[in-house]
Structures are given as structure tokens and as C-alpha cells.
Amino acid sequence: MSNCFNPANILLPNDCIDMEKWSVIACDQFTSQADYWDAVEKHVADAPSTLNVVFPEIYLGTITKQENDCNSSGDGVKNDKETGRKTKYASMTDDERIKYINTTMETYLTDGTLKQAVADGYVLVERTTESGVRLGIVGLIDLDDYDFDPKKKTLIRATEGTVISRIPPRVKIRENAAIELPHVMLLVDDPIDRQKIDGCQGATQEDAVNIAAVKHGIIEYVYAIRDTLRKLYDTELMQGGGHIRGYAVEGEAAKQVTEAFAAKQNSCGGFLFAVGDGNHSLATAKTCWENIKKSGKFTEEQLKTHPARHALVEICNLHSEALEFKPIHRLLTNVDVKDMLSFFEAEITKQGLESTEGEEIVFEYVESSATAIKNSGINITNRGDRLPVEILQGILDKYLETHGNVEIDYIHGDEALHGLVKETKGCGIFLQSIDKSTLFSAINAGGVLPRKTFSIGEANEKRYYMELSLIHI
């Protein structure tokens, strides 16, 4: 069996680039908060940045070519009369943005913006947020060892149901891209041997050869010997993202990391990594790879070494104290709240469920006849092993089928949802977090969790784009 996690040739910006402006948050964040992305664009200005080579999902499909022609101010920047926004990216059609991304990628590769920072190795990541210090190791996974079909018991598995309709637009972005930037975070169930790791503090270069012998807490062990590694970057992250440092894991240390994860793979019972963040991004990478295999353009030998066979990801330890599972809330807009709540109550009864006053699911809204915020919460008392989010999402999906004007978005953070309820006069639905210790057993038993069940940290604690790798020949 080949290893599913491997070293990579990793690209980073050259030493003259402002790393704080280079690194922006995952494209699937703040999808209802245009002000966030406007502020990012203003802050980055003309500096080299990952903002120029990713497609924030808030803009995906929001403007047609005809709208662009009508709203353009003549300088390639859209004037939005209602919001007063004037941003370059808000004015682009999807096709224009994708073409811009691909062109900018090629420019960064040829003008010296990017350099190979790590050869056949990994990057140890130290991310400091309000939740603490979260560690990770960036490397390549073999997409042949991953599938988003819950029936496939692969080494790398999705944690939530994949919405197939979300994949084609993302394939269009990736299929002609020269490079990839990961915001995918995979989780490994690797209990930490704290006593052994604490004994490694102040380790020397010679201690690196012991990595392969580590049976518990591989990432934490590498972090304990970080002073023996070459530092790659050390920067604050914009928009309250905290601080990040990266270290090159090369040579013998990289070989030992590969062996340590290979040993973990051989003893994991067929399930090594669970997708913590970026389920749909990884599903897109898988789809692109399958399309390449089906294209007939490459021989079997060429496919074995094709760069698109792999995806650059960050591996994090499920047992890290700084890795917190947060709930993902729902926001309904253009909704008749009274009608929706009646529908919800009727469905609860129809399913033979019972509810009492509680906090498992909390609805927050502004009544049409008032300005004050109202909220009501319930617990579902006889749900058995079903999660509240599973019951809720099933009912919402059914409601949306017959109420085409109602829109749903998925929101990270209590304060963000409170603000959006006031701003949109919609209905916010607050959920509780799940116990992360149950994740692997739940996926192993049931396939996937309901979509948008949990989030790793708050929105500003998500992965910021930093490292890159080539995916096209």
C-alpha cells in the first residue's frame, strides 16, 4: 500500500513580499458579509496577495456580463448605488474573475513573486488564535485515497454530505489553474503522549531522527523540535486572524515524518484522515483529478506522477486543545418567520418527535410588527442518536423546496449572526457544537454528518492561504 500523505515541493512568496497582505482567509468564509471582503481588497490594494488567485464565494455567480456592462464606472470597478461599494472584484463576472486568477497565477510563477521554499518536504504550521496555539503539517495527499461518496470506505473521508451542485462552478475555477492554495484541513485521531513530547523541548538536530518512532502526537513532536527547523515565515494575519509561523521540515526530518504517518496509516483500520474544513474544495480537487484520468490524454505511467493526483492540505490533530469545534448557524432571508416556524413545528410532530423549551435549536428574528429581537429555543427530547442539526437541516431542505424565494446561508459565530438578523430582518437559527471526540466513530459508523454540522474554530480562526503547489504539467 502506498502512502496517502507525502512530502511536497512547496511554493511561498519571495522574501520581499509583505506576508500579512499575502495571506487571506479561506474563500468560503464571510459569504454574507461583503464589508469583510471589501476591507480585505482595500487593505491589499496592489500588493501581491492570495486574494488575487482565489475566488471568494461571496462573489460567485453574483453578477452577469450584462449587469457588469450596465454598472461599470468605466475603470473596471463597479459602482453599487445602493451600498456605495466600489470594488474591482465585486464587478467581475465569474468568467472574468477566473481568467484573472489564471493569468495572475502565471504572472506570479514567472515574475519571481513565488519561489520554491521547500523541496520534497513539509511545512510545520504554528497558528495562534484566541483558542490557543493550533499546530499543523502541510503536505500532499493522494486523491486516489479519498472519496466524498460516503459508501466508499477510503483512508481519507468527507465529514459532511457533499452538495453535488456546488462542485461544477468550483471545477471551472480549478481545472485550468496552474497552482493550488489549500484551505483544506484534515484531522487525524492521534492521542498526544505529552510526557514524551515535553521531554523533547530543546532537542538538537540529531533528535529529528526519532520522529518515525513516535506513536502518539506526531505533529506535536515535530513542533517540540522546531528550533532545529528553518523558519519560513512569521507574520500577523489580517482582519483579526491572529499570528502564524511556518517551519521547513526537510531532509531526514521529512523522511521521518513520512514514515511516522505511514505507520499510523498501517494501524488506523482503514480510516486515517477526516476532512475538518474544505469538504467541497477537496471534492472539487477529486472531481478534477477523475476528469483528467478519464480524458485519455495521459498514459498510466504519466498519471502516476501527474501533479493533479495530489492535493496540498494541512493535517491537524483532533486532540489539540486549540482545535475547537464550533457550531455553524443558519440564516434564512426573504422568509415569513411565522410560516416557517409553523412548518417546523408541524414537521416535528409528523416525525413523531417531541420538543420542549431549551437551547439545542434557537430561532432569532424580528417580528414584522416590531423592532425588538425575539428568540425561542427548543430541545428535541426523543431524537435518539440523531443530531439536532440533522433534524433541522432535513426540515429546512423540505421547506426550501416549496419556498423558492427563501435563501439560506451558513454563518460562523454568534455575534455575526446576531448582526445579520438585525441587518437582513431574517431568521437566525443558532445551534450547539458537537463533541469532537465522537467524530471518527460517527463517520466510521454512519458515513457522513449532516452538512455544515461543525466548524473548526470561529470564522477568523479558519485557515489563511499561504503555501502553494503546482497542479498542472
PLM region spans:
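Active-site beta-strand/loop microenvironment that shapes enzyme catalytic pockets
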Residues: 253-296
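Charged substrate- and nucleic-acid-binding regions of tRNA-handling and nucleotidyl-transfer enzymes
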Residues: 390-470
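N-terminal extension/subdomain marker
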Residues: 1-236, 434-448, 460-461, 465-470
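Class I SAM-dependent methyltransferase SAM-binding "motif I" and its flanking Rossmann-like core
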Residues: 298-336
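Portal/gating segments that form or line small-molecule/metal binding sites
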Residues: 235-257
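A generic local secondary-structure boundary/capping motif
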Residues: 171-176, 265, 272, 301-302
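Non-transmembrane, aqueous-exposed alpha-helical and coiled segments at domain scale
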Residues: 288-289, 324-348, 352, 357, ...
